[in-house]
């Protein structure tokens, strides 16, 4: 379960441990990672080429995968490989390039880069079996999505 398991004494992984997760394919992508994606205590996630315009914002909850919710809430599938202009006031779901296969003792927290706020965008991370935005459960294995 995603919520109600958080403690306030969690630590942050330094870039060396993030690189180790990449080396062990516990964070992986079909494309090569760029060195500038790895920050002192975080990794920048990248949008993939597949997106959906959604009826509304949603969370899959602790029983469902995001992919099973897409057919229920998607209005349009979008290919982002040649660019796309997002409509203001609409909700989009974008599959990220990065996937996870985390060890049982590691969970994730996401927050948007400040540049997204300056562009007047509101983004949140969504993962399978989670009832909170911007959280990834311990030992999570699967894809990641951004809600825009």
What role is predicted for each listed range?
Residues 1-148:
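Non-catalytic terminal segments and appended small domains
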């Amino acid at each position: 379960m995603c919520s109600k398991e958080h403690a306030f004494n969690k630590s942050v992984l330094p870039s060396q441990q993030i690189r180790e997760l990449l080396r062990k394919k516990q964070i992986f992508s079909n494309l090569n990672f760029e060195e500038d994606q790895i920050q002192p205590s975080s990794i920048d996630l990248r949008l993939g080429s597949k997106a959906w315009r959604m009826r509304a914002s949603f969370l899959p909850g602790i029983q469902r995968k995001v992919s099973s919710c897409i057919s229920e809430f998607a209005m349009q599938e979008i290919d982002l490989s040649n660019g796309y202009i997002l409509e203001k006031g609409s909700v989009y779901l974008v599959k990220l390039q990065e996937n996870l296969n985390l060890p049982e003792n590691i969970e994730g927290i996401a927050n948007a880069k400040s540049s997204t706020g300056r562009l007047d965008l509101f983004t949140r991370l969504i993962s399978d079996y989670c009832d909170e935005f911007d959280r990834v459960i311990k030992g999570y294995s699967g894809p990641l999505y951004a809600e825009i």
